[in-house]
Regions:
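Glycine/Thr-rich phosphate-binding loops that ligate phosphate moieties of nucleotide
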Residues: 1-139
């Protein structure tokens, strides 16, 4: 199920698409924080690839919510290149996993304050909690 809060008769397709992108970015932020908790360290930069990286709105929102830079991989072959890099490193033919990989392409820096990012994520988490509560109540 999905919900959209704050819809009115003036809400158009652009606002709905933006809401979906913001929801994706917020969920990724939750996952990154969970990974940081499991790793016991802070992620300093998020490197991304794939079709959704074509959305500058999503990438900027991601940087804003995480409060870290988001770097786009410059090749559409990121997965294959990553596998090759791991194989080279595993065969001791490279000194690091990243050796020989292209430098990141575009970089998005956070453009909102940490306090604003926290408020947006808290609003997202409250909305998710309301949806989860309504689902647990049954039909």
């Amino acid at each position: 199920k999905a919900t959209f809060e704050g819809l009115s008769l003036d809400t158009g397709a652009a606002e709905i698409v933006r809401a979906v992108l913001e929801g994706i970015a917020a969920q990724v932020a939750v996952l990154v924080r969970a990974a940081e908790s499991d790793l016991g360290e802070t992620i300093q930069v998020l490197r991304v690839d794939g079709g959704l990286t074509r959305s500058s709105v999503l990438m900027q929102t991601q940087a804003d919510l995480l409060q870290i830079p988001v770097e786009l991989f410059p090749s559409p072959h990121a997965t294959a290149l990553g596998v090759a890099a791991l194989a080279r490193y595993g065969a001791r033919a490279a000194k690091s996993i990243g050796e020989g990989l292209p430098a990141p392409g575009r970089r998005y820096e956070p453009s909102i304050s940490a306090a604003a990012a926290t408020r947006r994520l808290e609003r997202f988490e409250r909305a998710v909690a309301r949806v989860m509560e309504s689902l647990s109540e049954g039909p």
